[in-house]
């Protein structure tokens, strides 16, 4: 994206129009190089983002966008324009980057130059960086699992982190064994490739004692293990590492923009495959925090690797708040579809702060319930817990309650991105913007 160096091509301006009816007042119309709004300018930012992305993707070659005209619409009605401006910049960077492809003739994306006042330049530059790391997460999400496995995932981020002032720690198989991370190691038993725990630390606020831990599920391919997925259910399981890509990309965005905050990403990385040594239903594994877990279903593996990573963030990294991101339960597609990401929180104050961050980022989230009753079906006669149950109902809430057993008293927010991580077979980099805003807010608390 170019700033104030316009192409010799048409310029898109934003304007408000009164020729649409009330039913169209929140819709975005694209007419002859102009982006027109109905009676009201957009406050439903997710819908606006979708409309703008759709418009930009239809454009060819080069395009100028007049952001000053956009800001003026909000100022004229005494509305805060910053979130709206962030959404526009996010939409532009989203469309400028080609998703992962191995086509011999990949689609050429539109190049965008923006016209903007100098007072908005810093915000635009900041959010262009965020958009670039959203795109990094998208690229990793779309990469086939034979090219992106735990060791390669680590290498990609080690390279991307060069010069950003972050500290990278990698726990390899021997380290995980020494640490007794039995849940992560149990999931890994069927794979020929070793597991990894990737830690990316960014500490840039010495005045604060707060550390935000972002924990990501990094199953680089999920076959279901011995409870193998059938039919079409194995398609798209390369996206089971989306949480790890998202949290790691977020920390790099914060570091690139030198945000005054303390944040650490923890990515639990492994494949979940069947094999002669794979864990089986009825096995009992010991978690990093010492709790024992009976395996009821090997396809409920995400909560296992997250449990060890969450305990590690609390015990070893001394996190004061933990947010985990995971493609955890397929039920989310029935509950919230691809519109909202489901959020579970052990703390109302933590939820309030997270919701504020999501609003600032323009990403739709919805809080779902946690209750001790949901945990009862996960009681085991032989271990402290079991990882799943045949009892119907509230499966997503039950998974969240399972994770809460490993937080060591630290406030936990669980983000289930099972239905929003990828849409129409393309990674979305969902929640990078929200997590970025949350970490940036923490610096001001």
From Swiss-Prot:
<feature type="binding site">
    <location>
        <position position="299"/>
    </location>
    <ligand>
        <name>Mn(2+) 1</name>
    </ligand>
</feature>
<feature type="binding site">
    <location>
        <position position="240"/>
    </location>
    <ligand>
        <name>Mn(2+) 2</name>
    </ligand>
</feature>
<feature type="binding site">
    <location>
        <position position="222"/>
    </location>
    <ligand>
        <name>Mn(2+) 2</name>
    </ligand>
</feature>
<keyword id="KW-0963">Cytoplasm</keyword>
<keyword id="KW-0378">Hydrolase</keyword>
<dbReference type="InterPro" id="IPR000819">
    <property type="entry name" value="Peptidase_M17_C"/>
</dbReference>
<keyword id="KW-0464">Manganese</keyword>
<dbReference type="Pfam" id="PF00883">
    <property type="entry name" value="Peptidase_M17"/>
</dbReference>
<comment type="similarity">
    <text>Belongs to the peptidase M17 family.</text>
</comment>
<keyword id="KW-0031">Aminopeptidase</keyword>
<feature type="binding site">
    <location>
        <position position="301"/>
    </location>
    <ligand>
        <name>Mn(2+) 1</name>
    </ligand>
</feature>
<dbReference type="GO" id="GO:0030145">
    <property type="term" value="F:manganese ion binding"/>
</dbReference>
<dbReference type="GO" id="GO:0005737">
    <property type="term" value="C:cytoplasm"/>
</dbReference>
<dbReference type="GO" id="GO:0006508">
    <property type="term" value="P:proteolysis"/>
</dbReference>
<keyword id="KW-0645">Protease</keyword>
<feature type="active site">
    <location>
        <position position="303"/>
    </location>
</feature>
<dbReference type="InterPro" id="IPR023042">
    <property type="entry name" value="Peptidase_M17_leu_NH2_pept"/>
</dbReference>
<dbReference type="InterPro" id="IPR011356">
    <property type="entry name" value="Leucine_aapep/pepB"/>
</dbReference>
<feature type="binding site">
    <location>
        <position position="222"/>
    </location>
    <ligand>
        <name>Mn(2+) 1</name>
    </ligand>
</feature>
<feature type="binding site">
    <location>
        <position position="217"/>
    </location>
    <ligand>
        <name>Mn(2+) 2</name>
    </ligand>
</feature>
<feature type="active site">
    <location>
        <position position="229"/>
    </location>
</feature>
<comment type="function">
    <text>Presumably involved in the processing and regular turnover of intracellular proteins. Catalyzes the removal of unsubstituted N-terminal amino acids from various peptides.</text>
</comment>
<keyword id="KW-0479">Metal-binding</keyword>
<protein>
    <recommendedName>
        <fullName>Probable cytosol aminopeptidase</fullName>
        <ecNumber>3.4.11.1</ecNumber>
        <ecNumber>3.4.11.10</ecNumber>
    </recommendedName>
</protein>
<feature type="binding site">
    <location>
        <position position="301"/>
    </location>
    <ligand>
        <name>Mn(2+) 2</name>
    </ligand>
</feature>
<dbReference type="GO" id="GO:0070006">
    <property type="term" value="F:metalloaminopeptidase activity"/>
</dbReference>
